[in-house]
Regions:
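C-terminal segment of classical bacterial N-terminal signal peptides
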Residues: 17-23
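Gram-negative/organellar outer-membrane beta-barrel architecture
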Residues: 421-434, 439-626, 631, 701-707, ...
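Bacterial N-terminal signal peptides that target proteins for export
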Residues: 1-9
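Sec-dependent N-terminal signal peptides
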Residues: 8-17
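Patatin-like phospholipase
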Residues: 23-66, 74-376, 380-385, 391-397, ...
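C-terminal outer-membrane beta-barrel translocator/porin domains of Gram-negative envelope proteins
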Residues: 618, 622-757, 794
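Periplasmic polypeptide-binding modules associated with outer-membrane biogenesis and secretion
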Residues: 294-297, 304-493, 505, 519-536, ...
Length: 809
């Protein structure tokens, strides 16, 4: 017999001896407490124990948990069983959940264009950057918790939940451990998981709460204080890693958290009667990906099976019999009496009315088949989607009856308040949310509207509380925390041509008047470019027709190649532009604009030659009409899986505009992505461009992006007219690792200057690549083989393209 089992039997015997000293009419049996530790994704291992408790029908009287243990414990306390929690964990997209912003397809157009272009985004108080209190504000997490706990949000004392529970947190202000026993259950769940620097702290009165695992990751003492006589604890954290295993940022963070509370963890471990420790070797607190989650749950089930003998001993030592939703109570010689009656899950029908409809009273004999019949009759009224019950033994003569209902009818909103909005007016938020008093409360629809408003970029968090008003009415209290009007964005990009390029972008909302926005961006190092844009999309970022004005200065290198594909010179492509126009916006996927532009070109070679005709200098003043249109419903800018990006642009410079060089050019391209069987992605890109014969050389097409064309090097293709097609296959090797196969070819080329058209051969290329998604953005390596020049069909070359970061130009 192993030591933990001996310890459990000894503890149970002591309790039984104590209980035997009580009178035969004693109302009490030994109370069982459940403790679930923190551990990030490792906390999913708790599901194995919860399912084992369900299958053995062991009643839990108290629950205390920290971090992920607090979340699963709270949900178990309000009626989610182990199987339901397993499905919830497996069906949740945890990676998306930990990103605050809506999916790209739901962002407003202007926010969509800024997303995934910069590594760092800061709010600015005045002109000083204000770093966030955590990498994740927890917006989506908060809304998920609110949806899951909605029927119990009117219960303010956690002792009144179906199973009394506690969530453990730490107050950053005082440094004290905080045991949350009342208030909003969803907010308590959010507080206990607020890992410092990862998640923003939660304001709770005068406190700032973070993950309780810092001080008490295995809160056995908390559940003992609640009244537990027997404690079952599941520990998935607080193991100090050896030196050779501390080899990642997550391991360093995990080790740091574990060190702070190691002494209390050791003390609490000794106080547990059943201590279950899943073997999670090789897994980390950050393993929120599908295959890792499955492995963690599997390992948790394995540990629960290993503890099954001890749990069975506990069950029969306490004479618990069949107790969870039973149709028989085998441990009782005669029907026990109902000592307490609790009804949960109702949001519209008052308790008093349900109590009368049920017709069961404390003191009545507990006959499960009779209770089942009453619930069948209750459901037959048409008021309920589902009903159920649990019978929890209290003593050898008494039980507690827990009735669970899920109503057909949803409550109506009696009133709405909004607080925390200092800059955004009540009416603006009220109109954006689109909910009114008298509406039926649909938490899923409410969450969608909140995320739509959140996508505007004005708020750090938006959450809500629901207060029951009785008689199928609730009061909705919405709490917002605004972000400053100013934003600062920082980005880095590296590729084999431009080398390092840095970007600093500034955004100012509501400049002078509500809805007027100013964007400015400076790119420097590998190229120099400044853009500034003043426009009026309105506060809701969806004004169908809006005015804009912009300016741009650009100084970028351009490589010049001869007919053999050899670089013979480089130019500085300098231009200064100012323009104004009107934009057209349809929903968040289609955008078009027309602008009148004045552009000053100053193009000069980087070499000095006595014969200026070889590499001339151009200084031209151009006046242009520019028309652009694009459709964008890609699901991701960095690594698209599905969707279409289509872009059209026309540019014309006419004598009537008093321009130095008249010309016209037009281009269109479509980029289509489709993913099948989750790992296989096919991409089809088609590009077409045509221009007038006298197009100035600085307006030619230059290939400058290996994501469009491989084979030739940067700028080796310089044409008036060009059309090409690209086919790409991408395979996901792991969560952030992809293999790529690429092939492309031109099918139309045209180059005309002073000489007649050249006889051009088509340009082709194929390649293989690896893409890795890192914290700094995608890392791309592509090895290609392809044409060296359109003028020499027999010339081919091998190129290696490397880039990392967020491409912002």
């Amino acid at each position: 017999m192993d030591a933990p089992l001996k310890k459990l039997i000894f503890a149970v015997l002591l309790l039984l001896i104590s209980c035997s000293a009580l009178s035969a009419n004693s109302m009490e049996r030994p109370k069982i407490g459940l403790v679930l530790s923190g551990g990030g994704a490792l906390g999913f291992a708790h599901i194995g124990t919860l399912k084992m408790l369900d299958s053995l029908q062991i009643p839990i009287d108290y629950i205390a948990g920290t971090s992920m243990g607090g979340i699963l414990g709270a949900l178990y306390a309000i009626g989610y069983d182990g199987l339901e929690l397993e499905k919830l964990v497996q069906q949740t997209d945890w990676i998306d959940l930990f990103t605050d912003h809506p999916s790209r397809g739901k962002l407003p157009y202007f926010e969509k264009k800024m997303a995934d272009r910069f590594q760092l985004v800061f709010s600015m108080e005045g002109f000083h950057p204000s770093p966030p209190s955590g990498l994740i504000f927890g917006q989506k997490v908060t809304l998920l918790f609110s949806s899951l706990t909605f029927p119990y949000e009117h219960i303010h004392s956690f002792d009144r939940l179906p199973i009394p529970c506690r969530c453990v947190a730490v107050d950053l202000v005082t440094g004290n451990e905080v045991v949350l026993d009342r208030g909003s259950l969803a907010r308590a769940m959010r507080s206990t998981m607020a890992i410092p620097t990862i998640f923003s702290p939660v304001e709770w009165g005068d406190s700032l709460l973070v993950d309780g695992g810092i001080m008490n990751n295995l809160p056995v003492d908390v559940v003992r204080a609640m009244g537990a006589d027997i404690v079952i604890a599941v520990d998935v954290g607080n193991r100090l890693h050896p030196k050779e295993q501390i080899n990642s940022a997550l391991k360093v963070l995990d080790q740091s958290i574990n060190m702070l509370g190691i002494q209390k963890w050791r003390e609490n471990s000794k106080q547990a009667d059943v201590l279950i420790r899943p073997d999670l070797e090789g897994l980390t607190m950050g393993d929120f990906v599908e295959d890792k989650i499955a492995q963690i749950i599997h390992d948790g089930k394995t540990a629960a099976r290993q503890a099954q003998t001890g749990l069975v001993v506990l069950k029969y030592a306490l004479n618990l019999g069949d107790i969870r939703n039973p149709l028989k109570l085998t441990q009782y010689k005669k029907p026990p009496k109902i000592f307490g009656l609790q009804i949960t899950g109702h949001t519209t029908i008052p308790f008093s009315e349900l109590y009368e409809m049920l017709g069961i009273r404390p003191g009545d004999p507990c006959r499960p088949h009779k209770i089942h019949e009453r619930l069948v009759e209750l459901k037959a009224t048409g008021e309920f989607v589902s009903t159920g019950f649990d019978v929890i033994p209290v003593s050898h003569e008494h039980v507690r009856l827990l009735i669970r209902v899920r109503e057909q009818k949803r409550p109506r909103i009696h009133g709405i308040t909004i607080d925390g909005n200092e800059r955004m007016g009540f009416q603006f938020l009220y109109q954006c949310l689109g909910i009114r008093p008298g509406d039926v409360l649909d938490t899923e629809a409410l969450n969608r509207q909140i995320m739509k408003v959140y996508g505007l970029g004005y708020f750090e968090t938006i959450r809500y509380d629901i207060e029951s008003m009785g008689e199928d009415r609730v009061f909705l209290r919405i709490h917002v925390k605004e972000l400053p009007y100013r934003k600062l964005r920082l980005g880095l990009w590296f590729d084999t041509f431009h080398k390092m390029v840095a970007s600093v972008a500034f955004q100012r909302n509501d400049l002078l008047i509500n809805g007027l926005r100013f964007d400015a961006e400076l790119q420097m190092a590998g190229l120099l470019q400044f853009t500034g844009k003043l426009f009026y999309p309105s506060q809701t970022l969806n004004l169908p027709v809006y005015p804009f004005a912009y300016t741009r200065y650009r100084n970028a290198p351009v490589a010049i190649y001869d007919g053999y594909g050899h670089q013979i010179a480089s130019y500085k492509d300098k231009s200064a532009t100012i323009g104004a126009g009107l934009g057209l916006l349809l929903r968040n996927a289609f955008h078009a604009d027309v602008a009148l532009i004045q552009e000053h070109m100053f193009i000069e070679p980087d070499i000095a030659l006595s014969d200026q005709t070889l590499f001339p200098t151009w200084e031209d003043r151009l006046r242009e009409v520019r028309l652009t249109a694009e459709f964008d419903n890609l699901d991701s800018r960095l690594i698209p899986s599905n969707g279409l990006y289509a872009h059209f642009q026309y540019e014309g410079s006419f004598d009537e505009l008093n321009t130095d060089v008249p010309y016209q050019w037009i281009h269109f391209y479509a980029d289509l992505f489709h993913t099948f069987q989750s790992k296989h992605t096919v991409r089809l890109l088609n590009y077409w461009r045509e221009s007038t014969s006298r197009l100035p050389v600085y307006k030619h097409y230059y290939n400058d992006d290996p994501e469009h064309l491989i084979g030739p090097d940067y700028h080796q293709v310089a044409m008036n007219d060009v059309s090409f097609v690209r086919l790409e296959y991408r395979y996901r090797l792991a969560q952030s690792l992809y293999m790529r196969l690429i092939a492309n070819t031109t099918y139309r080329l045209g180059f005309q200057l002073d000489d007649p058209s050249y006889d051009l051969s088509q340009i082709w290329g194929f390649g293989i690549g690896i893409k890795v998604m890192s914290l700094l953005g995608p890392i791309d390596i592509v090895l290609s083989r392809g044409s060296k020049s359109a003028y020499r069909e027999d010339q081919a070359q091998t190129n290696l393209f490397f880039s990392f970061g967020y491409r912002f130009f």
